[in-house]
């Protein structure tokens, strides 16, 4: 009977806790390019207009809606090590040998008291701690992004993404950031190391991704377990 009485309370606690567990969400889908109505250039009678390509300029992304290929090559490694050692020791002893002859009276009050050895203490502690951490990440991919905004200084805001599905497992790559037109090569390719405020997300969704995390009950118990 006690078990049935406690069960509703546990279910209420689980319900409260599960609402607080927030799973990390990947970056949102790329923002669609703004529909900008291009100005109608005046034709001064020439065969070439500003709306067409130039004979003296590479065919690179430079306007809203243009696409650019991003070569993603991210490599990062970090390590940290720390150690601490402390120690302290102290000792103290005190006794009463002669004090106007009253040291004998102290011994007469209690036969277990020795006036010559009243206090004798010692203290010692030691601490030794160490820790180390290391991390290494590599990401190599190619992604086509779209210019979604042109800043007043000429820099371009880009965003893009792609999804590859293999055996019902989705591999998702999302990217957004700011690039300079000068960093775009003649083949209309820009390296990810030249992207300002780059946000690159490489996530997965499917059976394999679900198996890489504990079950929901395990996560709940790990969250509320006080020991």
UniProtKB/Swiss-Prot annotation:
A lipid is attached at residue 16 (N-palmitoyl cysteine). GO terms for biological process: bacterial-type flagellum-dependent cell motility. Its main location: membrane. One of its GO terms (cellular component) is bacterial-type flagellum basal body, distal rod, L ring. GO terms for molecular function: cytoskeletal motor activity. Residues 1-15 form the signal peptide. A lipid is attached at residue 16 (S-diacylglycerol cysteine). It is found in: Cell outer membrane; Bacterial flagellum basal body. Assembles around the rod to form the L-ring and probably protects the motor/basal body from shearing forces during rotation. Belongs to the FlgH family. This is Flagellar L-ring protein. It comes from Syntrophotalea carbinolica (strain DSM 2380 / NBRC 103641 / GraBd1). The lineage of its organism: Bacteria, Pseudomonadati, Thermodesulfobacteriota, Desulfuromonadia, Desulfuromonadales. The gene is flgH.
């Amino acid at each position: 009977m006690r078990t049935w009485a406690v069960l509703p309370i546990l279910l209420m606690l689980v319900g409260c806790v599960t609402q607080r567990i927030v799973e990390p969400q990947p970056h949102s889908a790329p923002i669609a390019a703004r529909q900008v109505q291009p100005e109608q250039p005046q034709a001064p009678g020439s065969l070439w207009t500003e709306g067409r390509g130039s004979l003296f300029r590479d065919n690179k992304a430079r306007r809203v809606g243009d696409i650019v290929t991003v070569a993603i090559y991210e490599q990062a490694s970090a390590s940290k090590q720390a150690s601490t050692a402390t120690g302290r020791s102290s000792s103290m002893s005190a006794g009463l040998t002669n004090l106007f002859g009253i040291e004998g009276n102290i011994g007469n009050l209690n036969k277990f008291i020795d006036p010559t050895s009243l206090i004798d203490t010692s203290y010692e502690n030691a601490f030794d701690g160490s820790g180390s951490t290391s991390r290494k990440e590599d990401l190599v991919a190619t992604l086509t992004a779209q210019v979604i905004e042109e800043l007043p200084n000429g820099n371009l805001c880009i965003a893009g993404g792609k999804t590859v599905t293999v055996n019902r497992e989705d591999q998702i790559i999302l990217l957004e950031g700011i690039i300079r037109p000068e960093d775009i090569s003649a083949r209309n390719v820009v390296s990810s190391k030249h992207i300002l405020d780059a946000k690159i997300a490489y996530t997965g969704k499917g059976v394999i991704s679900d198996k890489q995390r504990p079950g929901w009950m395990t996560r709940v118990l790990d969250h509320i377990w006080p020991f």
